[in-house]
Structure formats: structure tokens, C-alpha cells
Amino acid sequence: MKRLLIQLLVMLALPSVVNSSHLNNQRELTVTSESTKESIELAKYLKDTGVVKYSAYWCPNCLNQSELFGKQAYRELNVVECARDGINSQTQLCIDKKIKGFPTWEKMEN
């Protein structure tokens, strides 16, 4: 029983270890995957149509979504950092927008 409990704890902890490996001491996400042509086109479309991603550098789901886009496409996105201690933090904007969870996507009105 003790061995089973240890295995379960290791399995539960592993995803957070993997996700945290993409975080650096500079308080920003580090996207490492390569983008596809389609993901770059999608990111440009989202940017051009006023879609904004509210994110936090420590958020595992934010990282997972960013990795799906890849590093080239990620640079095209409109991303607002909501964590107070994040690089280029816009915490007050996140508070004003009533962002409660991460990631949150919003289509800005023109």
C-alpha cells in the first residue's frame, strides 16, 4: 500500500515538474516548441482581429496552450501578463477586466 501511495504521488507531481521546467527566473513563460505554418497564421489572425490572451507566467495551462502555438506564433499573439511579479505585468488591466482565471481569451471591441 505504501508503495502504491508513493507511485501515485510521483505521478501527480510529474506534470508540475515538467511544466515548471519551462519557467525561468525572469518570471516569464519560455515556449520551446516550433510553430507550424498554420499556427503562425492563426496567431496573426487572432492578433489582427483583436483577440487578447490574459495569462500568468506560472500557469501550467497557459504554458500548455502557448506550446501548442509554438515559439514563433506565440510572439505574434497579444498576451497580457497578469501576475504581479511577471515581466511587463499589467495587473491593473487584469483587475479592471475582472480576469478570474488563466488563461482567459477575449475579443476586444473595435
Residues covered by each model-derived region:
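Thioredoxin-like thiol-disulfide oxidoreductase module
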Residues: 66-70, 78-102, 106-108
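Local sequence-structure signature of Cys/Sec-based thiol-disulfide redox active-site neighborhoods
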Residues: 35-76
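Short, intrinsically disordered/low-complexity patches at protein termini
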Residues: 15, 77-78
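Bacterial N-terminal signal peptides
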Residues: 8-15
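Positively charged n-region of N-terminal signal peptides that target proteins for export
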Residues: 1-4
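Boundary at the C-terminal end of the N-terminal hydrophobic targeting segment
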Residues: 18-20
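Transition segment at domain starts
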Residues: 25-38
